[in-house]
Design a protein with these regions (language model features):
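Active-site loop/lid in soluble adenylation, ligation, and acyl-transfer enzymes
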Residues: 2-156, 272-308
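A short glycine-rich, hydrophobically flanked beta-strand micro-motif that places a catalytic Asp/Glu
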Residues: 76, 199-216
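A short mid-domain helix/strand-loop element embedded in enzyme catalytic domains
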Residues: 144-178
Length: 308
């Protein structure tokens, strides 16, 4: 497969792990690199094959969403770690977005949680979220418990730091009507239901993940970016979960490494005090191999396809 970026595409912008190229007025190309980041810090280590696994996983899920009848911005893969997608306008000024705006990125992230994990567990522990809000009939819940009622949160997408939003503000800044907002929630529920069934075949539990959307030129909802990858979502091993073990099978594995080394505490202390942030150390060679193997293994378990 040849890449438009080799000839006609102009470099547009670079994220922590993804490069974006302008191909035409209506197309952009994503290049998924082998870089890896945690806590908004790019680790100075490359993970072999990581970019390819994420691109192929993202393609897999976008096609699954299309099978359910939903629109996506996906057009085609142009290389092992690249995909061509429809271009939408990115509007940073919320005042310029309204109910009539078309062909734009909805400036929201939707985080769908099926189990108590990550930051949700932290907020429950600190009393910031009442378990009753999640459908629990008790005051205390343990890490790893299945949430009785699917919990979908919304945060900002285009601000320097993602900020949690109540529904009223989410509607205000996104130009969405209440009906469109509810349509997004229903779309997420349907897609996540299929995701859970598919990954269960690979012995996985889909714990949580985020999704992004845009409106096309007819102002019809479509999936933007990728979802369901080992970077975007959290997965646990089903057999081990049934034995009471929540084994991280996604980028969380790398986060846990830096938590154990004490780096996360050091970093967040510096951020709270407004001090210079410490550089994130490189991963040791044995960890790089483990992480690369993890991404390949996750690709095969998520999609049911052989990597090679």
């Amino acid at each position: 497969m040849s890449s438009p970026s080799n000839t006609s595409a102009g470099f547009s912008r670079e994220g922590k792990v993804k490069r974006v190229y302008d191909v035409s007025d209506k197309e952009i190309e994503f290049e998924f690199t082998d870089r890896i980041s945690v806590f908004d810090k790019i680790i100075p280590s490359k993970i072999p094959f990581k970019g390819e696994t994420l691109c192929r996983e993202g393609t897999f899920w976008l096609k699954e969403a299309e099978k359910l009848g939903f629109l996506t911005h996906f057009m085609k893969m142009t290389d092992k770690n690249k995909m061509l997608v429809k271009k939408v306008n990115i509007i940073h000024d919320y005042s310029k977005i309204n109910h009539n705006t078309k062909n734009y990125l909805i400036p929201l992230e939707f985080i769908c949680r099926h189990y108590v994990a990550g930051s949700l567990h932290d907020r429950i522990e600190k009393g910031k979220i009442d378990p009753k809000e999640l459908g629990f009939g008790k005051k205390t819940v343990a890490y790893g418990e299945k949430i009785p009622e699917l919990f979908i949160e919304t945060s900002t997408k285009l601000e320097p730091v993602d900020r949690p939003l109540e529904k009223k503000e989410a509607l205000s800044i996104s130009g969405l009507t209440e009906e469109e907002y509810n349509n997004i929630l229903e779309t997420i529920i349907k897609v996540d239901s299929k995701m859970s069934k598919i990954v269960e075949k690979g012995g996985l539990i889909h714990v949580d993940g985020k999704k992004e959307f845009g409106m096309n030129e007819e102002r019809t909802l479509m999936f933007i970016d990728v979802f369901g990858t080992a970077d975007e979502d959290r997965f646990w091993d089903k057999k081990l979960y049934e034995q009471g073990q929540m084994v991280e099978l996604s980028k969380e594995f790398v986060r846990q490494y830096y938590i154990k080394t004490g780096y996360k505490t050091e970093l967040y202390d510096a951020r709270e005090k407004g001090q210079p942030e410490p550089d994130i150390p490189a991963l040791p060679e044995n960890m790089i191999k483990q992480v690369s193997d993890l991404y390949i293994n996750m690709y095969e378990r998520i999609t049911g396809e052989k990597f090679r």
